[in-house]
């Protein structure tokens, strides 16, 4: 029991800064929305539309670079720290190549925006302008993620938290300058949010790079031979590990976007109730997601040490802590669901629907916690392909079709409306949780030599 208690303390020490970093990131989006809304409703809508396109594109790159964390954790655990600098350099090359692709996609996103049904031309122009300002921050964001993944792979999660809050503090005044046109800058409205956020991502990257350069604990990792050329072998391996994670993230984000589109014709009350429940459950998701990042670090480190039993302990402890957290958040959600809904809206119909959907959200929080921590465990074992196949099958083959049938057809029961889609979420997430656990059990039952050989690749 003592080993699990000790492991839980180490996991929480890693996870809490990640949680706070995610809070800072979420707060940046909130600040952008509020400040753009203070300028005009059209600008706020433009920021919302632009963000809905920015997120899938940038999260694809973010997911690709997550491969660095288990690689660095494993090298650190095995005492091969001299190889980490080369992996990080290749991470920067990969981030640079992906940035170009993301920027091209975002520059041409106007075709998608203007094809939206009945969109106001002025709104479309502002959304395109916002994206074309924001896209210059894509390299800064992805380079920051490489530096952050280096730190987290070395079990240092506090720098990411500090840089997150630094970004938030810089974002507010820079937003003010570019939205309203102060200190000689042009008055850009919502487009100014894009300029400010792009600038903030570069500030966060430069600050993180400065920390790494001066940190005593990373002196042995610094590159003294220049930046070096791309290494096709290392980059290929990073892509093999990262691409399944990137695709899983992309399909998860697009799933919720598709459901939002399917709910939109059902009416204002249904859309508002769905959005409130989804927004709140997304906030709760920060806890298991951050714990999953910590589990990846611990599992990778233990495998680097050659301890498959230590990796099992880290995995089981992570699941136990995650389930306990999920039970607490589920009880909190059930108990205060009406009060929470009232924070968003005071329309009785909207509040009633949101409260009903939050009951379903409380049910799936446990499954969601298990599946996301399971994903973190599999990343630690460098078994990322299974993450993609499991999430794609659970969300798109099981969850979305069953949600559609329950919500919009009479095939099984009378049409359930938004609640049907939430039942689909429960089916999809529970399926993912079960499949993740089966895959984890299969991996852990393999001979230690095979597990360690996979981890050392």
Swiss-Prot record:
A single BP term in Gene Ontology: xenobiotic transmembrane transport
Membrane topology reported for the UniProt record: Multi-pass membrane protein
Chief place where the protein resides: membrane
Pfam families named among the record's database cross-references: MatE (PF01554)
UniProt-annotated location(s): Cell inner membrane
GO CC, alphabetical: plasma membrane
Family of the protein in this entry: Belongs to the multi antimicrobial extrusion (MATE) (TC 2.A.66.1) family. MdtK subfamily.
Reported function: Multidrug efflux pump that functions probably as a Na(+)/drug antiporter.
Name of the protein this chain belongs to: Multidrug resistance protein MdtK
Annotated organism of origin: Salmonella newport (strain SL254)
Taxonomy of the source species: Bacteria, Pseudomonadati, Pseudomonadota, Gammaproteobacteria, Enterobacterales
């Amino acid at each position: 029991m003592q080993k699990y208690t000790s492991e839980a303390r180490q996991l929480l020490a890693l996870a809490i800064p990640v949680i706070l970093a995610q809070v800072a990131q979420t707060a940046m989006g909130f600040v952008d929305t509020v400040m753009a809304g203070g300028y005009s409703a059209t600008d706020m809508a433009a920021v919302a539309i632009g963000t809905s396109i920015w997120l899938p594109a940038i999260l694809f790159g973010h997911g690709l670079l997550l491969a660095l964390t288990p690689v660095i954790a494993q090298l650190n655990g095995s005492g091969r720290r001299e190889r980490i600098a080369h992996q990080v350099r290749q991470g920067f090359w990969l981030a640079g190549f992906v940035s170009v692709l993301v920027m091209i996609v975002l520059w041409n996103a106007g075709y998608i925006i203007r094809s939206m049904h009945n969109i106001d031309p002025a709104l479309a122009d502002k959304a395109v302008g916002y994206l074309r300002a924001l896209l210059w921050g894509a390299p800064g964001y992805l380079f920051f993620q490489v530096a952050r993944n280096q730190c987290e792979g070395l079990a240092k999660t506090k720098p990411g938290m500090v840089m997150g809050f630094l970004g938030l503090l810089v974002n507010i005044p820079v937003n003010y300058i570019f939205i309203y046109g102060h200190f000689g800058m042009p008055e850009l409205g919502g487009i100014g949010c894009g300029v400010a956020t792009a600038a903030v991502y570069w500030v966060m990257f430069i600050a993180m790079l400065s920390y790494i350069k001066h940190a005593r604990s990373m002196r042995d990792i610094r590159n003294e031979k220049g930046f070096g050329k791309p290494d096709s072998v290392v980059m290929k391996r990073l892509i093999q590990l990262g691409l399944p994670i990137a695709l899983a993230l992309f399909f998860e984000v697009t799933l919720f976007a598709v459901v939002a589109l399917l709910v939109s014709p059902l009416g204002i009350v249904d859309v508002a109730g769905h959005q409130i429940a989804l927004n709140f459950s997304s906030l709760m998701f920060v806890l298991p997601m951050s714990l999953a990042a910590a589990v990846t670090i611990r599992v990778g480190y233990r495998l680097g040490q050659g301890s498959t039993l230590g990796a099992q302990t880290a995995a089981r402890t992570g699941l136990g802590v995650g389930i306990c957290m999920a039970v607490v958040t589920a009880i909190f959600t059930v108990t205060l669901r009406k009060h929470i809904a009232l924070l968003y809206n005071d329309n009785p119909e909207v509040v009633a629907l949101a409260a009903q959907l939050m009951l379903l959200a409380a049910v799936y929080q446990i499954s969601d916690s298990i599946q996301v921590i399971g994903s973190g465990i599999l990343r630690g074992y460098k078994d990322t392909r299974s993450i993609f196949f499991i999430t794609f099958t659970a969300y798109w083959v099981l969850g979305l079709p069953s949600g559609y049938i329950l919500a919009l057809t009479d095939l099984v029961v009378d049409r359930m409306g938004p609640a049907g889609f939430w039942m689909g979420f429960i089916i999809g997430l529970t399926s993912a949780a079960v499949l993740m656990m089966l895959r984890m059990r299969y991996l852990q039952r393999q001979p230690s030599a095979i597990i360690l050989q996979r981890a050392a690749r």
